[in-house]
Amino acid sequence: MGKRDKKTKDVFEYMYDDDENGIFWTREFGDLGNWEEEKSCKLFKRTMDTVNSKNNRSMDNLAKGLIVGHTPQYMNNKGINSSCGGKMWRVDIGASKAFGPCTNGDYENKFRKCAVLLIENGDECKIIKEK
């Protein structure tokens, strides 16, 4: 196993950490509550810096954005939405019936309708919604 393999293993261990604050499990980006945009964008920047440094990316191949799931937005009366200059997107609309008890079975909530984040040319984002 060479250095690259060990580095790759370290990146995956970091990313798939079962800790509730691990990158795949944290809900900090989804439910900002009373957080100010500035504070959430500082956390976003730190996360991007960490991801890029852990992946040893060159300056011309840096990850520039983050798509966040596992953070139902209908609870905040929102659908797919972004912050940090359109670089961080929250895409979980709470479509799972598991969230039924949270809305007394209100599956017709306009923020739970099917929606897709379309990304074209690497950075052009458009939300496509069910009518």
Please describe what each predicted stretch is.
Residues M1-K131:
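Feature recognizes metal-dependent phosphohydrolase scaffolds
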